[in-house]
Amino acid sequence: MASMQKRLQKELLALQNDPPPGMTLNEKSVQNSITQWIVDMEGAPGTLYEGEKFQLLFKFSSRYPFDSPQVMFTGENIPIHPHVYSNGHICLSILTEDWSPALSVQSVCLSIISMLSSCKEKRRPPDNSFYVRTCNKNPKKTKWWYHDDTC
């Protein structure tokens, strides 16, 4: 447990001092617990999401960094994207089978920025309605169905 807390403290400082572009740690979210963070995000300039504001929820288990964090969009504005379900779940391989303890909150944030920035058309995943009706509340317990090369 102590190594998890040390790692989270280190990542928290890194996110506060050098956040990825368009990302800001919601300071209130970490006041009561170091195991649940909210990161405020703004869509990158020149993309379909330019100026849009989103929130990412990170939840860390006691096995972090050996287990990936649970990461999902939360709040009023969930991006419309082929790999983001309307309940906020994100289909991104580094959040599941491609996770490595060498990855960090910053690398997850950068991957999500990249995923949104490369989007050519705002649309939901093809199975959005079915998935949202039948999925587990924890996206880490999802067996993802791949619709293209990445998800």
Swiss-Prot record:
Q: InterPro entries from the entry?
A: Ub_conjugating_enzyme, UBQ-conjugat_E2_core, UBQ-conjugating_enzyme/RWD
Query: What is any one of the record's Gene Ontology cellular component terms?
Result: nucleus
Q: What is the effect of changing residue 91 to S?
A: Loss of in vitro ubiquitin-conjugating activity
Q: What pathway, per the record?
A: Protein modification; protein ubiquitination
Classification via Gene3D superfamilies: Ubiquitin Conjugating Enzyme (3.10.110.10)
Q: What is its main location?
A: nucleus
Q: Per the record, what are the reactions this protein catalyses?
A: S-ubiquitinyl-[E1 ubiquitin-activating enzyme]-L-cysteine + [E2 ubiquitin-conjugating enzyme]-L-cysteine = [E1 ubiquitin-activating enzyme]-L-cysteine + S-ubiquitinyl-[E2 ubiquitin-conjugating enzyme]-L-cysteine; S-ubiquitinyl-[E1 ubiquitin-activating enzyme]-L-cysteine + [acceptor protein]-N-terminal-amino acid = [E1 ubiquitin-activating enzyme]-L-cysteine + N-terminal-ubiquitinyl-[acceptor protein]
The answer to whether UniProt assigns keyword ATP-binding to this entry is: yes
Q: How does it assemble?
A: Homodimer. Interacts with FANCL. Interacts with STUB1/CHIP.
Q: What is this protein called?
A: Ubiquitin-conjugating enzyme E2 W
Organism phylogeny? Eukaryota, Metazoa, Chordata, Craniata, Vertebrata
Name of encoding gene: Ube2w
